[in-house]
């Protein structure tokens, strides 16, 4: 339901989550509570089982190994300013599979390959401010508690000068962000920083 009791939005079932560091499709519950005279305080809380990649309900994975929950707090109390804090806790464990391996006696045997690993815990902040409708600042920073690193940061400034001249400056920092069991960890990678500007 939407705007229940003028304070609450409720979503139940399969849905796409887009809440700062929390992104993905889950089967679960999403609640948004809106408070304040102008609904300037908003808190979204969500949780559930990660939807299978096939989006089918057959062979549904165990929730204890495939889940996603988190929250995002929004603030709109200052004119033309929006700020948000987010937290995401997600765990997706690949399905086990059978494969042929060589044992210590060099015999070919079939083994079941299983996976495990910690949940992915992320936190972030997003800021957006517009001044006099003409000038804008946007910034964000996302941190991975599991890997203990900042994996994304961004700052963007746009200014409108007299004669409708517009200038901008932008800084972006990125690190590849893989899940714990991803095959991409075997490859070398570099951090990426970009600085740009123009008029």
Enumerate the predicted regions with their spans:
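Gram-negative and organellar
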Residues: 1-199
């Amino acid at each position: 339901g939407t705007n229940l009791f003028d304070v609450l939005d409720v979503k139940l079932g399969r849905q796409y989550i887009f809440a700062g560091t929390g992104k993905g499709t889950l089967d679960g519950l999403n609640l948004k509570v809106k408070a304040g005279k102008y609904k300037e305080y908003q808190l979204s809380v969500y949780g559930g089982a990660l939807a299978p990649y096939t989006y089918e309900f057959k062979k549904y994975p165990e929730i204890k190994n495939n889940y996603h929950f988190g929250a995002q707090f929004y603030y709109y109390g200052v004119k033309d300013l929006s700020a948000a804090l987010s937290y995401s806790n997600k765990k997706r464990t690949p399905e086990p599979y059978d494969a042929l391996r060589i044992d210590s006696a060099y015999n070919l045997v079939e083994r079941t390959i299983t996976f495990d690993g910690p949940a992915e815990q992320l936190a972030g902040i997003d800021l957006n401010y517009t001044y006099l409708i003409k000038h804008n600042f946007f910034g964000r920073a996302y941190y991975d508690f599991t890997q203990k690193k900042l994996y994304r940061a961004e700052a963007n400034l746009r200014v409108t000068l007299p004669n409708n001249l517009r200038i901008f400056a932008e800084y972006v920092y990125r690190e590849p962000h893989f899940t714990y069991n991803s095959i991409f960890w075997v490859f070398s990678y570099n951090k990426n920083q970009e600085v740009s500007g123009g008029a």
